Amino acid sequence: MALNLRKNHQILKIINDALIDLPAPSNISTWWNFGSLLGICLITQIVTGLLLAMHYTADTSLAFSSVAHMCRDVQFGWLIRNLHANGASFFFICIYLHIGRGLYYGSYLNKETWNVGVLLLLALMATAFVGYVLPWGQMSFWGATVITNLFSAIPYIGQTLVEWAWGGFSVDNPTLTRFFALHFLLPFVIVGLTLVHLTFLHETGSNNPLGIPSDCDKIPFHPYYTIKDILGFVLMLSLLVSLALFAPNLLGDPENFTPANPLVTPPHIKPEWYFLFAYAILRSIPNKLGGVLALAASILVLFLTPLLHTSKLRSMTFRPLSQILFWTLVANVLILTWVGSQPVEHPFIIIGQLASFTYFTIILILFPLAAALENKLLKL
């Protein structure tokens, strides 16, 4: 009998084991679609980004006009740019939902997969930040200035570190050039990390909504979940194309239509919407170093979640107290996002401080306490 090429060819075998014959739990819901959606986001961003890089000029005197030229003179350049800019927003929507799913269903107990996932989030945030600087508009320039300046809060080496990152004494041409180089490089780092993420995931297999082992009831990934994923792709890409065609500037800052000017500071310097929650945490602490530490902690706290799991049940499906806390945390992050977009004045300052305090309290204190209490109530 002839060998089945799909199952025996060195390379096809890897693809087969990851996407076709992969044993998957029979009951995973739509919340498990976001991993593949993130893969589609990554591919879309790399393809559109490559096409944009072919027309972009990484020079302070030409960057802004090269982006304008792309939108005016390049065939479908406006579409490619709008897809790329809004694709970033969809990337973050998907990753935040993906992380939320992981927190709710206890997926973080696959420790290696989770930790690589947090590294992926950090890499994505770095990529988005350096990418936002490239059009060299007002918010690009001042965003870069404000965020890179945070490193100067590091004791002793801070100022040297910032000037080394800038390549001079302010954000200027060398900064733009290196940010373009980093923005080109980092997505490929993300691809590499994604493969590591999947390798670790396929060691243990997917979690499921019940949070119980599903070895006794597995189904092949293809055709069941390939079809389910394709439905997700169609829905997400429809939304992305609709946003890029009907409201391409909805999520952008009007300030970025003005070329960068080091002599004029915009009235409200704020990042893109997907960083606002972290920006609100940064601003809520009146000390520079303290703010930077809180900003870092807001993301790095995710590394601690596997260590803070005190429940005897993996998922929150049967844990009503933890569910209430989880949805409170979601509402809290939305409040932080809103506060981050507001000016630094009363009452936003105190709201931001309370929301920042609540964010860390829920994750570090209330989640473990509620889980321990549920163990008692359920006599586990």
Curated annotation (Swiss-Prot):
<feature type="binding site" description="axial binding residue">
    <location>
        <position position="84"/>
    </location>
    <ligand>
        <name>heme b b562</name>
    </ligand>
</feature>
<dbReference type="GO" id="GO:0046872">
    <property type="term" value="F:metal ion binding"/>
</dbReference>
<keyword id="KW-0408">Iron</keyword>
<dbReference type="GO" id="GO:0006122">
    <property type="term" value="P:mitochondrial electron transport, ubiquinol to cytochrome c"/>
</dbReference>
<keyword id="KW-0249">Electron transport</keyword>
<dbReference type="InterPro" id="IPR005797">
    <property type="entry name" value="Cyt_b/b6_N"/>
</dbReference>
<keyword id="KW-0479">Metal-binding</keyword>
<dbReference type="InterPro" id="IPR036150">
    <property type="entry name" value="Cyt_b/b6_C_sf"/>
</dbReference>
<feature type="transmembrane region" description="Helical">
    <location>
        <begin position="179"/>
        <end position="199"/>
    </location>
</feature>
<feature type="binding site">
    <location>
        <position position="202"/>
    </location>
    <ligand>
        <name>a ubiquinone</name>
    </ligand>
</feature>
<feature type="binding site" description="axial binding residue">
    <location>
        <position position="98"/>
    </location>
    <ligand>
        <name>heme b b566</name>
    </ligand>
</feature>
<keyword id="KW-0349">Heme</keyword>
<feature type="transmembrane region" description="Helical">
    <location>
        <begin position="289"/>
        <end position="309"/>
    </location>
</feature>
<dbReference type="GO" id="GO:0008121">
    <property type="term" value="F:ubiquinol-cytochrome-c reductase activity"/>
</dbReference>
<feature type="transmembrane region" description="Helical">
    <location>
        <begin position="227"/>
        <end position="247"/>
    </location>
</feature>
<keyword id="KW-0812">Transmembrane</keyword>
<dbReference type="InterPro" id="IPR048259">
    <property type="entry name" value="Cytochrome_b_N_euk/bac"/>
</dbReference>
<feature type="binding site" description="axial binding residue">
    <location>
        <position position="183"/>
    </location>
    <ligand>
        <name>heme b b562</name>
    </ligand>
</feature>
<dbReference type="Pfam" id="PF00032">
    <property type="entry name" value="Cytochrom_B_C"/>
</dbReference>
<feature type="transmembrane region" description="Helical">
    <location>
        <begin position="114"/>
        <end position="134"/>
    </location>
</feature>
<feature type="transmembrane region" description="Helical">
    <location>
        <begin position="34"/>
        <end position="54"/>
    </location>
</feature>
<keyword id="KW-0496">Mitochondrion</keyword>
<feature type="transmembrane region" description="Helical">
    <location>
        <begin position="348"/>
        <end position="368"/>
    </location>
</feature>
<dbReference type="GO" id="GO:0005743">
    <property type="term" value="C:mitochondrial inner membrane"/>
</dbReference>
<keyword id="KW-0472">Membrane</keyword>
<feature type="transmembrane region" description="Helical">
    <location>
        <begin position="321"/>
        <end position="341"/>
    </location>
</feature>
<keyword id="KW-0830">Ubiquinone</keyword>
<feature type="transmembrane region" description="Helical">
    <location>
        <begin position="78"/>
        <end position="99"/>
    </location>
</feature>
<comment type="function">
    <text>Component of the ubiquinol-cytochrome c reductase complex (complex III or cytochrome b-c1 complex) that is part of the mitochondrial respiratory chain. The b-c1 complex mediates electron transfer from ubiquinol to cytochrome c. Contributes to the generation of a proton gradient across the mitochondrial membrane that is then used for ATP synthesis.</text>
</comment>
<feature type="binding site" description="axial binding residue">
    <location>
        <position position="197"/>
    </location>
    <ligand>
        <name>heme b b566</name>
    </ligand>
</feature>
<keyword id="KW-1133">Transmembrane helix</keyword>
<dbReference type="InterPro" id="IPR005798">
    <property type="entry name" value="Cyt_b/b6_C"/>
</dbReference>
<keyword id="KW-0813">Transport</keyword>
<dbReference type="InterPro" id="IPR016174">
    <property type="entry name" value="Di-haem_cyt_TM"/>
</dbReference>
<keyword id="KW-0679">Respiratory chain</keyword>
<comment type="similarity">
    <text>Belongs to the cytochrome b family.</text>
</comment>
<dbReference type="InterPro" id="IPR048260">
    <property type="entry name" value="Cytochrome_b_C_euk/bac"/>
</dbReference>
<dbReference type="GO" id="GO:0045275">
    <property type="term" value="C:respiratory chain complex III"/>
</dbReference>
<dbReference type="InterPro" id="IPR030689">
    <property type="entry name" value="Cytochrome_b"/>
</dbReference>
<keyword id="KW-0999">Mitochondrion inner membrane</keyword>
<dbReference type="Pfam" id="PF00033">
    <property type="entry name" value="Cytochrome_B"/>
</dbReference>
<comment type="subunit">
    <text>The cytochrome bc1 complex contains 11 subunits: 3 respiratory subunits (MT-CYB, CYC1 and UQCRFS1), 2 core proteins (UQCRC1 and UQCRC2) and 6 low-molecular weight proteins (UQCRH/QCR6, UQCRB/QCR7, UQCRQ/QCR8, UQCR10/QCR9, UQCR11/QCR10 and a cleavage product of UQCRFS1). This cytochrome bc1 complex then forms a dimer.</text>
</comment>
